[in-house]
UniProtKB/Swiss-Prot annotation:
<feature type="transmembrane region" description="Helical">
    <location>
        <begin position="55"/>
        <end position="75"/>
    </location>
</feature>
<keyword id="KW-0325">Glycoprotein</keyword>
<dbReference type="Pfam" id="PF01141">
    <property type="entry name" value="Gag_p12"/>
</dbReference>
<dbReference type="InterPro" id="IPR003036">
    <property type="entry name" value="Gag_P30"/>
</dbReference>
<dbReference type="InterPro" id="IPR008919">
    <property type="entry name" value="Retrov_capsid_N"/>
</dbReference>
<feature type="compositionally biased region" description="Pro residues">
    <location>
        <begin position="233"/>
        <end position="246"/>
    </location>
</feature>
<feature type="glycosylation site" description="N-linked (GlcNAc...) asparagine; by host">
    <location>
        <position position="137"/>
    </location>
</feature>
<dbReference type="GO" id="GO:0019068">
    <property type="term" value="P:virion assembly"/>
</dbReference>
<feature type="topological domain" description="Extracellular">
    <location>
        <begin position="76"/>
        <end position="536"/>
    </location>
</feature>
<protein>
    <recommendedName>
        <fullName>Glyco-Gag protein</fullName>
    </recommendedName>
</protein>
<feature type="compositionally biased region" description="Pro residues">
    <location>
        <begin position="210"/>
        <end position="223"/>
    </location>
</feature>
<keyword id="KW-1043">Host membrane</keyword>
<comment type="function">
    <text>Plays a role in viral particle release. Presumably acts by facilitating the fission of the virion bud at the cell surface.</text>
</comment>
<feature type="compositionally biased region" description="Pro residues">
    <location>
        <begin position="177"/>
        <end position="198"/>
    </location>
</feature>
<dbReference type="GO" id="GO:0020002">
    <property type="term" value="C:host cell plasma membrane"/>
</dbReference>
<dbReference type="InterPro" id="IPR002079">
    <property type="entry name" value="Gag_p12"/>
</dbReference>
<feature type="region of interest" description="Disordered">
    <location>
        <begin position="494"/>
        <end position="536"/>
    </location>
</feature>
Length: 536
């Protein structure tokens, strides 16, 4: 029992219980406890003598000091961090955005960081992860970004443009981080003349060094007008204009060399229109279509099914200007028409082959001779071959015009009406194109003039139609006469300002008339009232 009491006393002393009990006896006024103290003094004494209380206070102080020390250490470390151009731009991000806005582009901070620290570094063109890249590395990144096709990065254009602007026109906070400019390359010093060494004797004779002639690139062809620019020597400069020595024959020069020599000898002050140069034996030179010509014609013109008139006019100008051969015509049709369209064109062209009387013939041998479907043996250098090609090109144009005609549809012709601001001439041209496209009739045929005249009158704009219908002797007018009258009416149209002024004057006159009528009504009412008052 005594042992238990001693253990309890030891634990009580460890946690300050005995002190608490003593203080409690003092607080309640136990006898023999000495003078009484205030509650605050008693509480402080209890906390001071208790080991657990001191431990709690120590933990509270440590929990306050540790974050403070951590914050101070972090501030010290951050103050010693190396500043890089990307981080510098983030510190002045408002100025970077202003620079981008001045160029009409928009940049985002998050993507700016990703590009500068990751994507542009991974391009392997020398873009550093830290530090300022030189301008040549910036140019390499620009080449990758502006690359055509799927290899480019159009979404990164605003960012590299802004970076280029900061590098070429740097603000004050960027200049300290730019690499120093490269010193100018010194000019090479002129070499001082070396003293001439005395001639040395040699046991063997010195032979002049000669370069072996280069092998010709083109095969030898004496009849070819082309020259080998790698092996043929340039023509000599013109000397005196004296007559050539007798007995010597001037060798014939190539066409290009002679043209260059004539340009140097006789500089023309004015351009001259000269005929096409002929090759050897007065043979005309042949120039086939290039791939770029065919590509441009197909790219910049509508398909035949969409606008056959425009494509027919293009092919007509090509045939007249280039005078192509049979092979060239097939290449042209292959590039500009579909398989079904080519079939229709060739079929219509073979229908137009003239016979002996000048009218279309049905004889197969005559048709095959004039418009063959397989490659004929026509030599464009002979008059007979050129005549065959001329007839073939004419029939090809006739086939294009015949294939351009669609099934008769007069409803489509009636839908072509004159626009509000369209001139009569352009309206007539559209009307003729509709006749060619939707009817089998030729609008230029005098037998179809009456139909075209009626369509022109009734499909014109209302003001022109009303005045054309009131013309005297309308039956004797030709299409050109009606076009002149329509042009006069169109040119006498009032402008929008004149029409507005006319409507305003009409409204003003109407208001004045209404005002007068109201005045008369009021005067009548007043007079009647006065008469009633007098009678009463």
């Amino acid at each position: 029992m005594s042992g238990a009491s001693s253990g309890t006393a030891t634990g009580a002393r460890l946690f300050g219980i005995s002190s608490v009990l003593g203080e409690y006896r003092v607080l309640i006024g136990d006898e023999g406890a000495g003078p009484s103290r205030s509650p605050s003094e008693v509480s402080f004494s209890v906390w001071y003598r208790s080991r657990a209380a001191r431990l709690v206070i120590l933990c509270l102080v440590a929990s306050f000091l540790v974050p403070c020390l951590t914050f101070l250490i972090a501030e010290t470390v951050m103050g010693q961090t190396v500043t890089t151009p990307p981080s510098l731009t983030l510190d002045h991000w408002s100025e970077v955005r202003t620079r981008a806005h001045n160029q009409g582009i928009e940049v985002r901070k998050k993507k700016w960081i990703t590009l500068c620290e990751a994507e542009w570094v991974m391009m392997n063109v020398g873009w550093p992860r830290e530090g300022t890249p030189p301008l040549d590395n910036t140019s390499q990144v620009e080449k990758r970004i502006f690359a055509p096709g799927p290899h480019g990065h159009p979404d990164q254009v605003p960012y590299i443009t802004t970076w280029r602007s900061l590098a070429t026109d740097p603000p004050s906070w960027v200049r300290p981080f730019l690499p120093p400019p490269k010193p100018p390359t010194p000019l090479p010093q002129p070499l001082s003349p070396q003293p001439s060494a005395p001639p040395t004797s040699s046991l063997y004779p010195v032979l002049p060094k000669t370069n072996p002639p280069k092998p010709p690139v083109l095969p030898p062809d004496p009849s070819s007008p082309l020259i080998d620019l790698l092996t043929e020597e340039p023509p000599p400069y013109p000397g005196g204009h004296g007559p050539p020595p007798s007995g010597l024959r001037t060798p014939a020069a190539s066409p290009i060399a002679s043209r260059l020599r004539e340009r140097r000898e006789n500089p023309a002050e004015e351009s001259q229109a000269l005929p096409l140069r002929e090759g050897p034996n007065n043979r005309p030179q042949y120039w086939p279509f290039s791939a770029s010509d065919l590509y441009n014609w197909k790219l910049h013109n509508p398909p035949f099914s969409q606008d056959p008139v425009a494509l027919t006019n293009l092919i007509e100008s090509i045939l007249v200007t280039h005078q192509p051969t049979w092979d060239d015509c097939q290449q042209l049709l292959q590039a500009l028409l579909t398989a079904e369209e080519r079939q229709r064109v060739l079929l219509e062209a073979r229908k137009q082959v003239p016979g002996e009387d000048g009218r279309p013939t049905q004889l197969p041998n005559v048709i095959d001779e004039a418009f063959p479907l397989t490659r004929p043996n026509w030599d464009f250098a002979t008059p007979a071959g050129r005549e065959h090609l001329r007839l073939y090109r004419q029939l090809l144009l006739a086939g294009l015009r015949g294939a351009a005609r669609r099934p008769t549809n007069l409803a489509q012709v009636k839908q072509v009406v004159q626009g509000k601001e369209e001139t009569p001439a352009s309206f007539l041209e559209r009307l003729k194109e509709a006749y060619r496209m939707y009817t089998p009739y030729d609008p230029e045929d005098p037998g179809q003039a009456a139909s075209v005249i009626l369509s022109f009158i009734y499909q014109s704009s209302p003001d022109i139609r009303n005045k054309l219908q009131r013309l005297e002797g309308l039956q004797g007018f030709t299409l050109s006469d009606l076009l002149k009258e329509a042009e006069k009416i169109y040119n006498k149209r009032e402008t929008p300002e004149e029409r507005e002024e006319r409507l305003w004057q009409r409204q003003e006159e109407r208001d004045k008339k209404r005002h007068k009528e109201m005045t008369k009504v009021l005067a009548t009412v007043v007079t009647q009232n006065r008469n009633k008052d007098r009678e009463e």
